[in-house]
Amino acid sequence: MKRFSDLNQIDISKLEVFFQPAKKTKKQTVVFAHGFSVFHSYFQSFYKTLTDYDYYAPLWPGHNVNGFDYKELSPIHYGELLAAFIENKDLENIVLIGHSMGAAVCSYAMNLLNAKRVEKLILLAPLSYCNLLRYFKIKSSFKKDKAERMANFKAMFQTKFSNLTDENSWENELSKHSKMAKKLSNNILKELPVLNKTYKNLKLPVFLVLAQNDLFMPTKLTLSYFNKYLIKNNNLQSSVILNSEHQMFNSKYESFCKAMDDILNHNKLSKIY
């Protein structure tokens, strides 16, 4: 796709965004960038606790409800959409959170945004070159037996397809989603050099949260890589959530909430939770 430097040129008219308004006096605005092959609701165990924050979660093409064009399946394009959305809504005082692929999307968006809009960036199990060391494990996820793939798909997308009742409809949606995911994974590999480089440009406070038992990335190497090579402006705090998996907000909910409370309310992060 054509790349844009002027955010006004980016069409966000079809971008679907989930919004949860603050129930109390708003502290800040949280914007969440979801990861690969998921629906935004996989983060709901945590975002439902954000009663003091306006909460936005854009749905990237391929993961949204109302259809997409295959040329839109691009993390770089998602970053452009994210930046254009924030500028268009004139959002300020933002806590920007990205999980997995979404972390790289956030990092790319920061290169396009007015940096003063975002107060802190939270990277949850971020996509980087380190993921290549788990490439074959990631690839094998596409080759699980049909029953397992269907069970995982239903668990992740039940909210999106709540109207589906028969198995044939579910199988049709899974087939379409699998085709999308393979195309997007190929584009992630193509765009990874650009995405990886954007982390080096981050100047705002950054909080890196990793899962101890992450199947999609080598946790210790990722921790070292970000601290030694990617973010070297003394603006990075990092932590590992013990006994957690890639979606640490679901596998170790209480520990994750403690880490997020420290970040959101105290601007600090312990080494482990």
UniProtKB/Swiss-Prot annotation:
Q: What is its EC number?
A: 3.1.-.-
For this protein, the record's InterPro entries field holds:
AB_hydrolase_1, AB_hydrolase_fold
Can you tell me which residues form the catalytic site?
Answer: H34, S100
- GO MF terms, alphabetically ordered: carboxylic ester hydrolase activity
Q: Does the keyword Hydrolase apply?
A: yes
| Keywords from the named record | Hydrolase, Serine esterase
Q: Locate the transmembrane regions by residue number.
A: none
Which Pfam family is one of those matched by this entry?
Abhydrolase_6
What family is this? Answer: Belongs to the lipase/esterase LIP3/BchO family.
Q: What is the protein name given in its UniProt record?
A: Putative esterase/lipase 3
Q: Which organism is it from?
A: Mycoplasma genitalium (strain ATCC 33530 / DSM 19775 / NCTC 10195 / G37) (Mycoplasmoides genitalium)
